Amino acid sequence: LIHFYNIKNKLFLSDLPGYGYAKAPKSKRFEWIKLMEGYFKNRSNLSRVFILIDARRGIKNSDHELMDLLNIIAVNFQCILTKIDKISSTALREVTASTLSQTEKYAASFPEILQSSSNKKIGIDKIHECLNLILNINNISKKE
């Protein structure tokens, strides 16, 4: 199941909820991976995939599976640590460093780890800046 969001006909977001849900049977997770692979391969206008990672948990095996897939099919991705208000500043520094060290091996990985908290509205402006930058880059390349 993929949820689609159209934002002012300028930005189209797709949400793949549950791909990392650990309690799902392996057969279901395999179906999700195949669905995602087909979706990502057939999207020529796909600029970047944002992988949301719970800062309390860090990168899970399912996240690595997704990163491997995106790297193989050459789709850029960037990690966003979520729920950063639920951990200490020391733990946040550690999970950020760990996430960066785990993702830098992927050629398709964007080298900046974003941080956010929807409850405290932390990092939302930075995510908006990132999306605006992507939109501006795409608009420039379409004009050329």
Regions found by a protein language model. Name each.
Residues N6-N9, N42-N45, N61, N71, ...:
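Detector for Asparagine
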